[in-house]
Amino acid sequence: MSMEKTFNLARRDDGIAILTMDVPGETMNTLKEQFGPEISEILTEIKADSSIKGLVVISGKADSFVAGADITMLAACKNEEQAKTLSQQGHVVFAELEGLSIPVVAAINGACLGGGLELALACHLRVCSDDKKTMLGVPEVQLGLLPGGGGTQRLPRLVGITTALDMMLTGKQIRPKQALKMGLVNDVVPNSILLETAVELAKKGKQAAKPVVQSKINQFLESTSFTRDIIFDQARKQVLKKTQGNYPAPAKIIDCVRQGMNKGMVKGLEVEATHFANLVMSKESAALRSLFFATTEMKKETGAEGAVPRKVKKVMVLGGGLMGGGIASVTTTKAKIPARVKDISEQGLSNALSYAYKLLDKGVKRRHMTPIARDNIMALMTTTTEYTGIKDADIVVEAVFEDLALKHKMVQDVERECGENTIFASNTSSLPIGQIAAAASRPENVIGLHYFSPVEKMPLVEVIAHKTTSPETIATTVAFARKQGKTPIVVQDGAGFYVNRILALYMNEAAQLLLEGQRIEHLDRALVKFGFPVGPMTLLDEVGIDVGAKISPILEKELGDRFKAPAAFDKLLADDRKGRKNGKGFYQYGPKAKKAKLVDESVYKVLDILIASDKEAKGVAERCTIQMLNEAVRCLEEGIIASARDGDIGAIFGIGFPPFLGGPFRYIDTLGASNLVATLQGYQSLYGDRFAPCDTLVKMASDGSQFYKK
């Protein structure tokens, strides 16, 4: 029976007891509601045993201390009162641990996150291993929550208000050396001596609190309630600017710290429990948690049921441009798989190597990586202008121009030069994969692998299967994309696939509003306020106006008139406006451009636009996004995407659809299909059939159905 316990206490001869946490049957430790009584029972036992002179809290898992609280228990909360009780139970247990008269040391190896760090903060001292898997942080904000186990109170008292706010508001994870420098841990040692170091610390007894390590200016600002309020007000302004008021958690985190530092820890904990409960029941946190569960669930899937992925040991990338260089870079850096880049020009190859080197060198400059580690990764990337050294390539990723004839030649070259099982993966952004596979003698090996730019930053890839792509090819490509650190969604073949298809209508509508006289900066601000990371005009400048102009005719030809792009694109290209890449777009670039982004007013003249009065921001955002919602449902209707879940993940990770809304499908459930259909029909009467609601939405409006169960 004792084997089934999570917490086990072992007494040593030297008077130090070891409390080992090891959740049975799970790879990582997470804190669960039912652990409270078990911990309290052990703490009572410790208090009653005078032979115990010190306590070390350690994990029984090889690679993690505690990865956080088990967030599935939050879904069971039916109201704020129940959620508040969860937080308060954590407060009681951690206060009991902190209140022990003997020294308590946390011995940390691996992930120490969320409730795990709060557990460590309740200990009197902390020592962590220097292992690369050891990371400390409070990432609750990423789930629309706040640290509800006393973290908002203990963390600022340990590392200072400014540092604590930075950790809690970003959810960033701290490496061991950084944790030592900021005073979050008392020592960093190799994992082999972690336990003994913690034992020695416990033997030394409780130590006087060290002064918080911080700059003179922060010392001054944190010294009185008046100056502390300057920090809180500044933090609040920055948060509001960043979140546009769409995420309630950051403001509540600031309030918890403010109240606790100004009115004492008891008040702070009370506020923390109240705010935590409010956030647990918020629609924003529900959406973010659903996204977390969806991506976790997706990681277990192969993309093709029953298929076993082949091992990928060598990769070739065709094309040394920005996309090719980025793909080769994530292959070597993240997947640690050798990549050979082929380009017709030495300059292209040089650019690809330089691109990868600069990305790695950033890590060296930030001390996240040694120069030797950088050079070892660079050694995995080789280049060629011919088809040499690729006979044993398992995957060839093609990243050349959007030209069907050129891609046909690439397929034939690869089939001639490589083995019969080599996968040909095209990074096309718009050409149907079936058309590319038409030139193949082994079409079952041809697949789409659509990355988003910049490759090293954008988390999504679309894995596109055409009608005869083999399940093994799909599974191997999905597994390869995951090794690159990507979130892959499997979509079926069709012009624009999923992400670019829903994005095109959004961009077209923004361009239409521009031609109607809406100012560029007003359009961008309206969509940023709605929750997108950047506005549509900024995005078009970044992606390239020429790229947008190339994709639109393909989509119009394959999918119909609703994809017809406004005449703006042709006029812009005639004026040689491609966006940031050539320093000429909707905004000013180059040395003349100031730090604050300024619109290039000459665009209005090029497009013969007469500036009109600003339409209401909400109306602008609605008109741009409503077609995206409609088209996402069409993609599900046509089988382009397999599920609403995949559609939500694709939109959030591919184009930055506001995460707090949960994705297009979850947002439609929030709006209600009948309301959405009525709004679409209203726009249809004003602007034409491009706003006609799709059949599935009309059916859902009549029968009241939803994509997700309540």
From Swiss-Prot:
Catalytic reactions of this protein: a (3S)-3-hydroxyacyl-CoA = a (2E)-enoyl-CoA + H2O; a 4-saturated-(3S)-3-hydroxyacyl-CoA = a (3E)-enoyl-CoA + H2O; a (3S)-3-hydroxyacyl-CoA + NAD(+) = a 3-oxoacyl-CoA + NADH + H(+); (3S)-3-hydroxybutanoyl-CoA = (3R)-3-hydroxybutanoyl-CoA
UniProt cross-references to HAMAP family, sorted A to Z: FadJ
Region named Enoyl-CoA hydratase: 1-190
Name of this protein: Fatty acid oxidation complex subunit alpha
Gene coding for it: fadJ
Annotated function: Catalyzes the formation of a hydroxyacyl-CoA by addition of water on enoyl-CoA. Also exhibits 3-hydroxyacyl-CoA epimerase and 3-hydroxyacyl-CoA dehydrogenase activities.
Molecular functions per Gene Ontology: 3-hydroxybutyryl-CoA epimerase activity; enoyl-CoA hydratase activity; long-chain-3-hydroxyacyl-CoA dehydrogenase activity; NAD+ binding
GO cellular component term, pick one: cytoplasm
This protein's pathway: Lipid metabolism; fatty acid beta-oxidation
Subcellular location per the Swiss-Prot or TrEMBL entry: Cytoplasm
InterPro entries registered for this protein in UniProt: 3-OHacyl-CoA_DH_NAD-bd, 3HC_DH_C, 6-PGluconate_DH-like_C_sf, ClpP/crotonase-like_dom_sf, Enoyl-CoA_hyd/isom_CS, Enoyl-CoA_hydra/iso, FA_oxidation_alpha_subunit, FadJ
Highest taxon, organism lineage: Bacteria
Protein's UniProt keywords contain RNA-binding: no
EC number: 4.2.1.17, 5.1.2.3, 1.1.1.35
Region of interest (3-hydroxyacyl-CoA dehydrogenase), ranges: 310-710
Subunit and interaction comment: Heterotetramer of two alpha chains (FadJ) and two beta chains (FadI).
